[in-house]
Every structure is written in structure tokens, then in C-alpha cells.
Amino acid sequence: MTLMDPLADAMATIKNNEMVGNKECVIEPASKLIGRVLKVMQEYGYIGSFEFIDDGRSGKFLVKLVGRINDCGVIKPRHPVKKDEWEYWEQRYLPARDFGLLIVTTPEGVMSHYEAKERGIGGRLLAYVY
């Protein structure tokens, strides 16, 4: 069986394990994009530590959960966002102002929408977490 969207599968795995109350989960297959998204989630305190496990194939991520996620998921299609449109997309995908975060990919790498706003750059929406 092939996966159509490994990032969507990873976010669903995190959400399901968080809802059940598990303290850790395994995300497979691993990719650079998933690793960068996990790093942004870790910076904002939505997950604890995570580590890459090399299994001889594509690898896995072992993620420690801290119980802060109410909902998370990917944004499809991956809308392009200009530097002055962040407010519109915050209202569309986040439940309240200054609550949660959008994860975006920009020419400068994967980051939160707060950081992209601060730097004055646009990008493409990848995921949301709150």
C-alpha cells in the first residue's frame, strides 16, 4: 500500500494518539519535511522530544507527546499566501486570535506563520495545530 500524503498520515497519527492519551507515538515513513514540521511543533511546545530511528528503509520518528494538542491536520490544497494575507488564513483555520499556529513552507524553510509574519515573507500553508 502506498501513501498519498505522508504528512497528512503523520498529523493524523499524532492527533489520534493524543486523543487516546498515549505518551508517545511512532510516525512512519520518515521524511525531511515531517522532521521539519515536528521541529516547529516542538519549538512551540505542542510535542516533547522526537528522534529519528533508522530501520534500514525510510526510517521512523518516535515522538513524545505532552497533551497540548486539541486538533491538528494538514491544509489541502496548499494555498499560497502573500506576506500581507496572514490574518485571513488565521481566521480561516485557527479557532481564535493568538491561539494555535499555522505551519508554512517559505523560501527560507519551514516555519510558523508568526515567524513568517515577523520576517515579512509569504509561503505555502502546510498544516495547522492548536
Curated annotation (Swiss-Prot):
Keywords annotated in UniProt: Ribonucleoprotein, Ribosomal protein, RNA-binding, rRNA-binding
Keyword rRNA-binding: yes
Keyword Membrane: no
Domain of life: Archaea
PROSITE patterns, sorted: RIBOSOMAL_S8
UniProt-recorded Gene Ontology molecular function terms: rRNA binding; structural constituent of ribosome
GO BP terms, alphabetized: translation
InterPro entries noted in UniProt: Ribosomal_uS8, Ribosomal_uS8_CS, Ribosomal_uS8_sf
GO cellular component labels: ribonucleoprotein complex; ribosome
Function, in words: One of the primary rRNA binding proteins, it binds directly to 16S rRNA central domain where it helps coordinate assembly of the platform of the 30S subunit.
NCBIfam families for this protein: PRK04034.1
Record-stated family: Belongs to the universal ribosomal protein uS8 family.
Record note on quaternary structure: Part of the 30S ribosomal subunit.
Designated name of the protein: Small ribosomal subunit protein uS8
Gene: rps8
